């Protein structure tokens, strides 16, 4: 079992941190590489467990994947993908059960080969994230989908058909899946109430470079099917969640961090909320500098919602900061159910948090104390590390393997700025 030991030295974090490419952008783009018979080259790819799992999935289908990974975490990584020899429609059940993004292969495989078999996807256990919305939309486009226990088989006779699809609820994954499904469909597909996160727009940009015909008008996305897509090169956008996490590390420790490779426009919806709790944001040509303005962290009332609002993936980290804020803070979680598991662990550090349905009330205290903690998912692991940076004494975070699904070399980056973090397997 992976463990992370954090020794609080009560030092403000000061230094520079390079922000890697976005995990939530690169995974759907890797799935979209299935469309092309030519080579795909992706730059600014993060070295993460989920990227390696998606690479293994592509290889299991017959693709050639070459991850050019620099040992220096400060360097950029490149991923080369060639799907010209895909010879298998069965997505590995073992890998798919561990990787939620595997479900994004459904649309590309169905569009290109007319058949795909997989299982319900895995990933973080943070409540219900049903795939019914994906399935209903694909069925509307002409797919026949059979579900047997945890197994899913999708087939189509000929091409998928363009349709007008309106999502009852905004869904990033479903939006991405249907965009990809529609690129080679016959006719025009319109998605209403579509997700427009930067990661979705990066996927669209990638598909357009490949030759797709896609237009975005607010939350309406129109895709006109084309005959084929080509190979291309593409640079993955910066990871706004990683940037937001390190921004909070600066605020929590009353330090000053320069986040390199990211601009304010990349994290504007996050930065706006951080300013309400007392963050100072300075713009530079090669990044942004985050620090705390004056005195203690301020309390706030924050609600998570689809983009362009505050993202759910930043909620656990924000709760860590609010644990030592002045006054009473409230967080409303409106995206995922059961995303307050980290609150129980923060309480072990002394945090004063009460939960009622989708609302967390945090009464800020002056200081936290080290404890033995158990991580539940990716973002809660990051949140516990942030809180441990200012908890008196030592904190051990067990089950911390989740962290490497979304953060490359987090302990090294923080240690280079003054933290004292040790990782053991």
Swiss-Prot record:
Database matches in CDD domains: UdpNAET
Disulfide cross-links: none
SUPFAM superfamilies given in the database record: EPT/RTPC-like (SSF55205)
Binding site residues for UDP-N-acetyl-alpha-D-glucosamine: 100, 169-172, 313, 335
Keywords, sorted A to Z: Cell cycle, Cell division, Cell shape, Cell wall biogenesis/degradation, Cytoplasm, Peptidoglycan synthesis, Pyruvate, Transferase
Modified residues (2-(S-cysteinyl)pyruvic acid O-phosphothioketal): 124
Annotated metabolic or biological route of this protein: Cell wall biogenesis; peptidoglycan biosynthesis
Residues reported in the UniProt entry to bind phosphoenolpyruvate: 23-24
Catalytic activity: phosphoenolpyruvate + UDP-N-acetyl-alpha-D-glucosamine = UDP-N-acetyl-3-O-(1-carboxyvinyl)-alpha-D-glucosamine + phosphate
GO biological process terms on file: cell division; cell wall organization; peptidoglycan biosynthetic process; regulation of cell shape; UDP-N-acetylgalactosamine biosynthetic process
GO CC list: cytoplasm
Pfam families to which the protein is assigned, alphabetical: EPSP_synthase
EC number(s) reported in the record: 2.5.1.7
Gene Ontology molecular function, alphabetical: UDP-N-acetylglucosamine 1-carboxyvinyltransferase activity
Record-linked PANTHER family: UDP-N-ACETYLGLUCOSAMINE 1-CARBOXYVINYLTRANSFERASE
Protein family: Belongs to the EPSP synthase family. MurA subfamily.
NCBIfam families listed in its UniProt record: murA, PRK09369.1
Function: Cell wall formation. Adds enolpyruvyl to UDP-N-acetylglucosamine.
Protein name according to UniProt: UDP-N-acetylglucosamine 1-carboxyvinyltransferase
Organism: Wolbachia pipientis subsp. Culex pipiens (strain wPip)
Gene behind the chain: murA
